[in-house]
């Protein structure tokens, strides 16, 4: 028995300590297998924020607050592509600012020019070679302040500028653009007072032997002041004067084109309704190519009285242009004449041609006081060459006026 016990003891000693530990654990687990049915306390390690009784988000913010923003950017953009893109956008933005600044520097004289315009509210700036030259020759322009030019002054201006003692000033082209509102100024502009047309009451009779007609200016106390106005004559074509009355033409370019055609074809004077026509601005002067300065132009404030008194006192005949759809109106019955009937009319009596705007024509109250009406036929309708289209149903008022003037002054 003793020998058997010794043998078991020796075998036990031969087992490794790890085996002894496993054996003890196994025996322990066997002995406590019943305890597994009871709640056991967890042996897992607590988190750091739980140990400190702190919120997880707050703990992370506090723990990593020392990490530099550069390290965060490096982690978000490890290859530097985002940084390069941001720098490129910044460079483009800076270049755009430089370009804008450079562009604005070209207009640094804008304030000077605007100040110049504000300092001279009683002046206007006539521009264009012919318009400026005609304005210098016009005695009605009694005050010329300065002649502004870019480059060189045309040779034909030198003598008249010296005679009138007009100050000349060399300016840059942009300043001329501002003063003329970007019109075609031909590098020259004249600072001068606006035209002040005479207001008249009516047209009087005329003396064909001396080729002069009388006009009656309206004075301050509504008194009529008579004046003589010479008119041009042509052999076998024009014995009596021809005037032009403009009603409700508001486009300055149309006014200028009409004045140019009237002067070229031989009209003696123009009368305008002050209240509803475009004023005689530098745009009108430029469009007329200087004819505004050469042709007598008058204003009337009472057109109906002007028509009536001119017919009674001077024997003037008023011929009104009218639209194609106006032939059925009562006041045109028996008064409509053709274009051919206008030929040589100024050999028989003094005539005032009345024209209106392109949309409505002459006002009805003026039509009712007119002696005759004339219409320009559309594209040879009578011959059947062309049918009228609603898109193009009329001529420009300046073209229509030129055709009517030419027919009146042509003797066939």
Swiss-Prot record:
Localization per Swiss-Prot or TrEMBL: Mitochondrion
Main location: mitochondrion
Catalytic reaction(s) noted: guanosine(2270) in 21S rRNA + S-adenosyl-L-methionine = 2'-O-methylguanosine(2270) in 21S rRNA + S-adenosyl-L-homocysteine + H(+)
Broadest EC class assigned to this enzyme: transferase
Matches recorded under InterPro entries: Alpha/beta_knot_MTases, MRM1, MRM1_MeTrfase_dom, Ribosomal_eL30-like_sf, rRNA_MeTrfase_TrmH, SpoU_MeTrfase, SpoU_subst-bd, tRNA_m1G_MTases_N
Protein EC: 2.1.1.-
Transferase is among the record's keywords: yes
Signal sequence segment: none
Biological processes, Gene Ontology terms: rRNA modification
Family: Belongs to the class IV-like SAM-binding methyltransferase superfamily. RNA methyltransferase TrmH family.
Note: Present with 2760 molecules/cell in log phase SD medium.
Function, as annotated: S-adenosyl-L-methionine-dependent 2'-O-ribose methyltransferase that catalyzes the formation of 2'-O-methylguanosine at position 2270 (Gm2270) in the 21S mitochondrial large subunit ribosomal RNA (mtLSU rRNA), a universally conserved modification in the peptidyl transferase domain of the mtLSU rRNA. This modification seems to be important for the normal accumulation of the mitochondrial large ribosomal subunit.
Name of this chain's protein: rRNA methyltransferase 1, mitochondrial
Organism whose genome encodes this protein: Saccharomyces cerevisiae (strain ATCC 204508 / S288c) (Baker's yeast)
